[in-house]
């Protein structure tokens, strides 16, 4: 079974609608990586407001969200602080989901958009699975806009918390940090590479099999879990720092 951490483009960019008043979606409808510097630096945004939505009883573990916040605090210059709001929704009952259906769900439920000095991030934990899954592939998450990503929590739960699998918290953390890093511009998506480390055979991923941004299969995840949680390697960190990050 191959586990996929995906990158999709679902942008609707309109350069004439850049008013950032907290209710205008346009600045948050760009392609993945377009807001990399906005996340990493405090040149434009001094704060980050994260909205986490989950379906039914599929709430992410509290430790997962704490891990995410710690990860962001270690990499992003946000002197005004990072907040995370968690909200429950009813099942959209549309599984399997296409990326356009995920984007439609976001349009229905997202309440925060960029405003003044605060950048907004949308994270959705969905039931069901992704439409491109097959008998041998399973998608765990996808970044699909500059400030939007989805995690398929049913799939994550099916592959965690057994004696031979990673804990649910660890697997959620891997997926959410991986997708966030695509929005931070890794690799070569908006944070230019300082050294070539692009795995061109697998899209915008890192060639280092020990890096968080490696194109991951089940065996890769298991190997990394056996040796501890995966982290960003030196090349990925250099890219983020060169684009305004810590």
Task: Show where each model-derived region lies.
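C-terminal motif of bacterial Sec signal peptides marking the signal peptidase cleavage site
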Residues: 6-9
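Active-site-proximal segment of zinc-dependent metalloprotease catalytic domains
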Residues: 115-194
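Sec-exported extracytoplasmic/periplasmic mature domains
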Residues: 72-81, 182-189, 241, 245
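The catalytic-center signature of Zn2+-dependent metalloproteases
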Residues: 163-235
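Short, cationic low-complexity segments
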Residues: 144-154, 232-246
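Propeptide-to-catalytic entry region of secreted or membrane-anchored zinc metalloproteases
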Residues: 11-130
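Sec-dependent signal peptide recognition
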Residues: 1-3
